[in-house]
């Protein structure tokens, strides 16, 4: 198993640094997993994975706060890759391939965050936009899978 989940250097030095400096939504250095998963959700909503170029470690895979998400990362890997060819189902145990895929979707999500931050320089408007996106992702999930979630009306 790889030792880190990676993000691009561009994002580390760009949007992630900006969010760290503003301590936006409490996504500080102690909650890297939350920030990564939020970017992942935005990337999945966008629908296009973006390959990482010049990446660095962002989350150590041995951290306890990321381990509960391994099943989620494998589920995404199954949904996006393995479901098209179920004879490869044994590859579901290949966590490194799952990490690579979620890194690509999170990479897209960080681009989405960067664009939002650029378009909404006002911190309050940016915060409202982020909360709106979280709500929309939650509603889409609820509708798609027929489950009630925290924000389901």
Name what the model sees in each region:
Residues 1-14, 18-22, 49-153:
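Charged, low-complexity intrinsically disordered terminal regions and linker tails
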Residues 23-27:
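Short pre-active-site segment immediately N-terminal to the catalytic Zn-binding motif
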Residues 28-55:
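Short, basic amphipathic alpha-helical segments that act as recognition/interaction helices
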């Amino acid at each position: 198993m790889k030792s880190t989940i990676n993000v691009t250097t561009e994002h580390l030095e760009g949007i992630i640094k900006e969010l760290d400096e503003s301590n936006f939504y409490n996504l500080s250095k102690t909650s890297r997993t939350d920030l990564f998963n939020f970017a992942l959700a935005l990337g999945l909503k966008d629908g296009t994975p973006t390959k990482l170029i010049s990446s660095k470690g962002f989350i150590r895979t041995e951290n306890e706060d990321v381990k509960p998400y391994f099943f989620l990362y494998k589920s995404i890997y199954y949904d996006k890759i393995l479901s098209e060819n179920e004879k490869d189902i044994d590859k579901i145990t290949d966590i490194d391939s799952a990490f690579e895929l979620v890194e690509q979707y999170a990479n897209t999500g960080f681009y989405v965050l960067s664009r939002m931050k650029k378009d909404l320089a006002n911190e309050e408007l940016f915060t409202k936009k982020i909360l709106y996106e979280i709500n929309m992702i939650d509603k889409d999930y609820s509708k798609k899978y027929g489950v009630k979630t925290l924000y389901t009306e």
